[in-house]
C-alpha cells in the first residue's frame, strides 16, 4: 500500500438534472381511503342523520301518543 492517493477528476462530479415535463399530483387525485373507511364514514353520517331526525320527530310522536292514551 504505497500511500498514493488518486486525484479526483473534475468530470467525475455528479450533476443534478430536472425533468422537462413535471407531473403534478393533487391531494384529491390520490385515493387514500380504503373501502372500509368509506363504509365507516357512511355509517357515522347515517347515525348522525338518524339522531337529528329522531330529535325532530320525538316531540310530535310523543305528543300524539299521549293524546291517544287520554282518549
UniProtKB/Swiss-Prot annotation:
Q: Does the keyword Nuclease apply?
A: no
User: Which keywords label this protein?
Assistant: Host-virus interaction, Inhibition of host innate immune response by virus, Inhibition of host interferon signaling pathway by virus, Interferon antiviral system evasion, Late protein, Modulation of host PP1 activity by virus, Viral immunoevasion
InterPro entries on file: PPP1R15, Prot_Pase1_reg-su15A/B_C
GO MF annotations in UniProt: protein serine/threonine phosphatase inhibitor activity
As recorded in UniProt, coiled-coil segments are none
According to the record, the residues making up region (Important for host CHOP inhibition) are: 16-18, 57-61
Per the UniProt entry, the effect of residue 57 to A is:
69% loss of host CHOP inhibition
Would you kindly state one Gene Ontology biological process term found in this protein's UniProt entry? symbiont-mediated suppression of host translation initiation
Q: What is the effect of changing residue 16 to E?
A: 83% loss of host CHOP inhibition
How is the quaternary structure described? Interacts (via C-terminus) with host PPP1CB.
Family, according to the entry, reads as follows: Belongs to the asfivirus DP71L family.
Name of the protein in its database record: Protein DP71L
- According to its UniProt entry, this protein's organism is African swine fever virus (strain Badajoz 1971 Vero-adapted) (Ba71V)
Amino acid at each position: 500500500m504505497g500511500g498514493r492517493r488518486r486525484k479526483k477528476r473534475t468530470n467525475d462530479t455528479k450533476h443534478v438534472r430536472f425533468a422537462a415535463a413535471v407531473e403534478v399530483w393533487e391531494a384529491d387525485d390520490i385515493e387514500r381511503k380504503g373501502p372500509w373507511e368509506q363504509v365507516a364514514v357512511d355509517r357515522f353520517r347515517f347515525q348522525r342523520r338518524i339522531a337529528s331526525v329522531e330529535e325532530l320527530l320525538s316531540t310530535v310522536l310523543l305528543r300524539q301518543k299521549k293524546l291517544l292514551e287520554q282518549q
